Amino acid sequence: MDAAEKKEVIKKKYQEIATLGGSCCSGGGCCGDLSAADLSRSLGYSEADVQAVPDANLGLGCGNPTAFAELKPGDIVLDLGSGAGFDSFLAAQRVGSLGKVIGVDMTQEMVKKAQDNARKYGYSNVEFRQGDIEALPLDDRSVDVIISNCVINLAPDKEKVFREAFRVLKPGGRMYVSDMVLLEDLPEDLKNDCDLLAGCVAGALLKEEYLGLLKKAGFSFKILAEDSDVSKRQYEGLPVESLKLKAWV
């Protein structure tokens, strides 16, 4: 599959999740039997987090970037691949009325779901925009912090994603990412498997390549945690790990 075909596969899958429910792993069997709430608890979300905006928690993450993001009141935060808004709303609690969270997602259905959740739960400091994280609908140097949870692996051109992230961050800006990376290369048939592509595996890069692109875009970074046991828990032994990092301009 070429990049356009991969994007279409991912877009259709997440449209389906937004409208019908389910998870990114439906049909792929990689997430086990955990509910969205239980998966979030296993990733370190508190019970208060899980209960705060339950309709926004679709169980699509591989970490909890709001837990290690150094957010403060007044920050302007960008959530790359915001989905139904779960992490965006948790970030909004941290930045308060003086701050703002902008969520960007490629699927109109997810954006609408997030907007509906914002109204339902009374979040006025969150805005959701439809857009491609490879070409962000934001001005240069306009955000203080970027968060992203298991999304960058889905983008065919990760170099563009990192360049765009660098572009929109203010001087001194920070990015906190939880994402899937490969520990060894996948065979071609798995790289083109639609379920694994939408399930955050087939589009993942080798860890060294991922970090190299981050550096090439201009970022300094620090790896905060690596979880290779996620392979056994959720991905049927495939050579992947959940990587958590902080990057800065």
From Swiss-Prot:
Coiled coil: none annotated. Keywords: Arsenical resistance, Methyltransferase, S-adenosyl-L-methionine, Transferase. Highly dependent on the characteristics of the thiol cofactors used, with some of them (coenzyme M, homocysteine, and dithiothreitol) more efficient than GSH. It catalyses: arsenic triglutathione + [thioredoxin]-dithiol + S-adenosyl-L-methionine + 2 H2O = methylarsonous acid + [thioredoxin]-disulfide + 3 glutathione + S-adenosyl-L-homocysteine + H(+); arsenic triglutathione + 2 [thioredoxin]-dithiol + 2 S-adenosyl-L-methionine + H2O = dimethylarsinous acid + 2 [thioredoxin]-disulfide + 3 glutathione + 2 S-adenosyl-L-homocysteine + 2 H(+); arsenic triglutathione + 3 [thioredoxin]-dithiol + 3 S-adenosyl-L-methionine = trimethylarsine + 3 [thioredoxin]-disulfide + 3 glutathione + 3 S-adenosyl-L-homocysteine + 3 H(+). Signal peptide: none annotated. GO terms for biological process: methylation; response to arsenic-containing substance. Changing C150S: Lack of activity. It holds the Pfam family Methyltransf_31. Its EC number is 2.1.1.137. InterPro entries: Arsenite_MeTrfase-like, Methyltranfer_dom, SAM-dependent_MTases_sf. One of its GO terms (molecular function) is arsenite methyltransferase activity. Disulfide bonds: none annotated. NCBIfam families: PRK11873.1. Belongs to the methyltransferase superfamily. Arsenite methyltransferase family. PANTHER family: ARSENITE METHYLTRANSFERASE (PTHR43675:SF8). Catalyzes the transfer of a methyl group from AdoMet to arsenite, producing methylated arsenicals. Involved in the conversion of As(III) to a number of methylated products. Reduces the arsenic toxicity in the cell and may contribute to the global arsenic cycling. This is Arsenite methyltransferase. The gene is arsM.
